[in-house]
């Protein structure tokens, strides 16, 4: 099994993701090869919480061009993790 910190890359901080935090839904950018079970186990291991559901979205790389050179940006994979109602919250920000 992979190390949990290799599966979870970073939290996604957007206006929509901060609104979802009130519903105990947290958004993370994850490894493109990780599946839902690996994401669930990694979140539970890193943060010590109980995960109820994991939704995953794939993003293709965007076409970019610099002068005569062209290519694609890296593809991404985003996971929205829903915690159980009795689980503690994840502290992403230090207040």
Swiss-Prot record:
Species of the source: Anoxybacillus flavithermus (strain DSM 21510 / WK1)
Residue ranges the record marks as coiled coil: none
A GO MF term: rRNA binding
Entry annotated with the keyword Phosphoprotein: no
PROSITE patterns reported for this sequence: RIBOSOMAL_L23
Subunit structure of this chain's protein: Part of the 50S ribosomal subunit. Contacts protein L29, and trigger factor when it is bound to the ribosome.
Keywords recorded for this protein, A-Z: Ribonucleoprotein, Ribosomal protein, RNA-binding, rRNA-binding
Any one GO BP annotation for this protein: translation
Family recorded in the similarity comment: Belongs to the universal ribosomal protein uL23 family.
Purpose of the protein: One of the early assembly proteins it binds 23S rRNA. One of the proteins that surrounds the polypeptide exit tunnel on the outside of the ribosome. Forms the main docking site for trigger factor binding to the ribosome.
Taxonomic lineage from the root: Bacteria, Bacillati, Bacillota, Bacilli, Bacillales
Keyword Ribonucleoprotein found: yes
PANTHER family xref list: 60S RIBOSOMAL PROTEIN L23A
Superkingdom of source: Bacteria
Transmembrane annotation, as ranges: none
Entry's Gene Ontology cellular component terms: ribonucleoprotein complex; ribosome
Full protein name: Large ribosomal subunit protein uL23
Record-linked NCBIfam families: PRK05738.2-4
